[in-house]
Amino acid sequence: MEHRVSADGGLPALPPAMPQFPPHPLRRACAWLLRRCGWRLVGEFPDLPRLVVIAAPHSSWWDGVWGLLCKVALGADIAFMAKRELFLGPLGWLLRRLGGIPIERAAAHGLVEQMVARFRASPQLWLGIAPEGTRKHVHAWKSGFWHIARAAEVPILPAAFDYPSRTITIGPLFQPSADLHADLAALRAFYAPFRGKHRNA
């Protein structure tokens, strides 16, 4: 199902179980910007309180711009990770309001353990991750998102940027199995048709 931003800036309602921000005037402004730039949302969000969202291809800083505009326009409270140092200055307040989670990279316990603990402590959490881990072309995805989803026992929701059609596509839910390599191959196959700003996934 395709959802185009309407002339009045409207977007489809989110499912009840999905984490959401309270209503805010900024949502309409972001929806207007998306409409003016021709971007649209394809697919539907599952009615689940906890999952891992993966976004690809990630080939430009513009991905963050369009993703953030869509997130705010929808009122979707999708969390994301950032290094703890970014939260110490004046930017920290804004990052937290937008769903940022400070990460202790030097902590004794690893990133996966930090996020699994966050899932176990949160009745509602959608965690967004770019599996490529960089805007540069990579031959292999980082597998942290898969390990987080497996350990937290939550599904994976693929989201794909396609610049030629200016769409953000929400894919079908993916249940991680015990086979990391097979799962990564299946997920990358989903992303094969989509084209980022500078390359495919």
Language-model segments: which ranges?
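Extreme N-terminal tail/first-helix region
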Residues: 2-42
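Soluble catalytic domains of membrane acyltransferases
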Residues: 19, 35-193, 198-201
